[in-house]
Amino acid sequence: MDIDGVDDDLHILDPELLQLPGLSPSPLKPTSLIADDLFSQWLSLPETATLVKSLIDDAKSGTPTNKSKNLPSVFLSSSTPPLSPRSSSGSPRFSRQRTSPPSLHSPLRSLKEPKRQLIPQFYYQHGRPPAKELKEQCLSMVDQVFSNYIDGLHVDEFKSITKQVCKLPSFLSPALFRKIDPNCTDIVTRDAFIKYWIDGNMLTMDTASQIYNILRQQGCSYLRQADFKPVLDELLATHPGLEFLRTISEFQERYAETVIYRIFYYINRSGTGCLTLRELRRGNLIAAMQQLDEEDDINKIIRYFSYEHFYVIYCKFWELDGDHDCFIDKDNLIKYGNNALTYRIVDRIFSQIPRKFTSKVEGKMSYEDFVYFILAEEDKSSEPSLEYWFKCVDLDGNGVITSNEMQFFFEEQLHRMECITQEAVLFSDILCQIIDMIGPEKENCITLQDLKGSKLSANVFNILFNLNKFMAFETRDPFLIRQEREDPNLTEWDRFAQREYARLSMEEDVDEVSNGSADVWDEPLEPPF
């Protein structure tokens, strides 16, 4: 094509010149071929040659190119290009097709970019704020309490806020007071309480989260044993069921320790000594704490807080601790339950396989270690107890109990039975009995999950290393069967504590009678301290 022979005047591009020849009835060309034909036809137009020559001259002379002026007028006359050429065959495909690019109002663009919807906030770093009605209701109760205390409340006056406004057990009052008053000014004002309880979104939390946040230390994501000490101190100072202990500080401290150890034994399933919010929610501690405000008889709250249960635990420890140095060794523990345990299982306990001792004295068990032991021994059906004894019997620590490991422990049981002229039982028979009771997934071994899935798991461990309980199981002790039927809701530990407290109380009464106390039978049974 001779560009130099073309007139320099810029002509208006006629859209009709871009029309393709009429289509034959033959099959339609592919879209790419149609585009090539259109482009070739455009290049052959005189106006195109003029435009190209003009752009080349501008480029050689260094003149800035004004693209909008150089474009043919057809591209400036409308914001959209013209329709594609009509086919002579009248094909509906060409009569309907548009080549315009997508615009803001294009339905294609609407499909690709849907309108943004406003999603309401669902995450709140410090908890969901209270609803307007709930907030107003709480403020009304706060105003009612603080109306008589314009300058604020002291700790002994704060209990009404804890119970009426916060709906929490009253013995949490000092802990809540100190949380709002970290600078120890000994007074909590209305504004300070509102800032902590309402503005801090404590109002909308569940009870477990509220108690967890009140008790935990700043910056900690768990509860320690020491965090429960203020709660127990207030309970001992105010609960009518513990009034008799208020003049005996030594046993107040022992009672508080025992309650805390029991809480961590059953609820702190990780065994780390760090109680998480999840563990607190999963346990039954909150229900027991709420019951304390409703029940004056502390012994009716058998979960954690029963004084009778503490009495049994402490007296058992005192009986074994011959030199009363507050430590127990192997020789002491082997006497537990009238020498019921085997030496092999006691060795495993003192090897600290099921749990590391808190005692700093080599070969000695502390009072806390004993609490864990006695709860495991007398409540073998509970999950913490099953985990405790499973670790003891799993000699190689591979997560399964094999027949060889069970035989290792039963050998000593068999020897003890022979020593007391008791009819011996073959281990093969015992093994079949255990398999029938547990129904493990694999018959050649027993897993922890197998034990947790059976109601007879406690009997397995009694067979292996507790002779007295094994014999009671074999003879089907009618007293134990009757006791289980009388109250099926009680745990093994509850029934044990009930029996032992009755026995210990009777022994105490006999001692008083032998010492010349004539009025002992006229007095109700109660602990000596």
From Swiss-Prot:
InterPro entries: EF-hand-dom_pair, EF-hand_13, EF_Hand_1_Ca_BS, EF_hand_dom. Ca(2+) binds at residues 394, 396, 398, 405. It comes from Arabidopsis thaliana. The keyword Metal-binding applies. Pfam families: EF-hand_13 (PF17958). Probable regulatory subunit of type 2A protein phosphatase. One of its GO terms (molecular function) is calcium ion binding. It comes from the Eukaryota. Residues 60-110, 507-529 are annotated as: Disordered. This is Probable serine/threonine protein phosphatase 2A regulatory subunit B''epsilon. PP2A consists of a common heterodimeric core enzyme, composed of a 36 kDa catalytic subunit (subunit C) and a 65 kDa constant regulatory subunit (PR65 or subunit A), that associates with a variety of regulatory subunits. Proteins that associate with the core dimer include three families of regulatory subunits B (the R2/B/PR55/B55, R3/B''/PR72/PR130/PR59 and R5/B'/B56 families) and cell signaling molecules. The gene is B''EPSILON. Residues 381-416 form the EF-hand domain.
